C-alpha cells in the first residue's frame, strides 16, 4: 500500500487534480429520424446505426 514519504503542498495536489473534470456527453443528430443520439451508438428512437436498421422498433 502506498504511503506518502513527504507532504505534498496544496498547489502540487491541485495541479495534479486539475485534469479531473467531467465532460458533458456529446450528442449528434440521427440522420434517419433527426433526434439526438450518442455518437457510435444505435439510435434509441428509430433503431438505425450507419444507415442500417439494427433494432426493429415495431411501430
UniProtKB/Swiss-Prot annotation:
GO biological process: translation
InterPro entries: Ribosomal_bL32 (IPR002677), Ribosomal_bL32_bact (IPR044957), Ribosomal_zn-bd (IPR011332)
Stated family: Belongs to the bacterial ribosomal protein bL32 family.
One MF annotation (Gene Ontology) recorded for this entry: structural constituent of ribosome
GO cellular component: large ribosomal subunit
Keyword line: Ribonucleoprotein, Ribosomal protein
Protein's name in the database: Large ribosomal subunit protein bL32
Keyword set includes Ribonucleoprotein: yes
Species of the source: Desulfitobacterium hafniense (strain Y51)
Amino acid at each position: 500500500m502506498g504511503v506518502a514519504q513527504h507532504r505534498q503542498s496544496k498547489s502540487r495536489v491541485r495541479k495534479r487534480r486539475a485534469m479531473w473534470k467531467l465532460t458533458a456527453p456529446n450528442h449528434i443528430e440521427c440522420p434517419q429520424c433527426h433526434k439526438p443520439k450518442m455518437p457510435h451508438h444505435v439510435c434509441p428512437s428509430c433503431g438505425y446505426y450507419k444507415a442500417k436498421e439494427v433494432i426493429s422498433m415495431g411501430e
